[in-house]
Regions:
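Bacterial extracytoplasmic/cell-wall-associated proteins, especially those involved in peptidoglycan
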Residues: 2-210
Length: 210
């Protein structure tokens, strides 16, 4: 089979994934002629992901991770943060939570389960997200990772996931409207961050719109 290292841990359809190759096609600009078929384009995108991951396969294996686990985690890191540093710190939060058997509690995975990922989300919508949705992608209710990725992670997200920061962070909250991310080691610190950087902004926006 082509790309055995990349596709060796591809999830099966009965794992609960929506699309088998979700997250495995590298996001980039591709040139193709009018007579190009879908199969050759997919092969080009898989080839690009394989090339970008080729120098990391040994590290992934050394860390006792599978390629699917890395792509799945990187797909969350991709959307949760926008800067390289934030992504490395976010990846560290996810690893720290996984190591302590804490649910990942990512809203990105919920939005994917709802079919809303990619749509603009307001602070209010983010705060009121349905964390009880019945889905294998609900990482509020289940421990561990989703069955597969929710988007195609960029090289920045892949690098952050393979070589994360070393922190004690267990929590983070992002202001979805500004992109700023706030990290915390304890729930108490996290609650303060949520209050200061999210809830206070919600109060301001609701009072200004009344």
């Amino acid at each position: 089979a082509k790309y055995p290292q990349l596709l060796g841990t591809l999830p099966s359809k009965d794992s609960g994934v929506k699309y088998l190759l979700e997250g495995y096609l590298f996001p980039a600009t591709y040139n193709y002629g009018e007579d190009a078929d879908l199969e050759s384009l997919i092969d080009q995108m898989l080839g690009a992901m394989n090339t970008n991951l080729s120098s990391y396969y040994s590290t992934i294996e050394a860390k006792n991770l599978t390629v699917n686990e890395v792509l799945t985690l990187a797909s969350l890191v991709e959307k949760e943060g926008s800067t390289d540093q934030d992504r490395k710190d976010i990846a560290s939060v996810f690893y720290n939570r996984l190591n302590q058997a804490m649910p990942l509690q990512s809203n990105i995975a919920i939005l994917y389960a709802q079919g809303k990922l990619g749509q603009k989300t307001t602070l209010k919508e983010d705060a009121e997200i349905d964390t009880n949705i019945d889905s294998p992608f609900n990482v509020y209710k289940k421990e561990g990772l989703m069955p597969g990725p929710v988007d195609s992670p960029s090289l920045s997200a892949l690098e952050a996931t393979i070589n994360p920061s070393k922190t004690d962070y267990l929590y983070f909250v992002a202001n979805v409207e500004t992109g700023a991310v706030y990290f915390a080691n304890t729930y108490e610190e996290h609650a303060k961050n949520v209050e200061e950087h999210v809830n206070s902004k919600l109060t301001q926006s609701s009072s200004s719109s009344n």
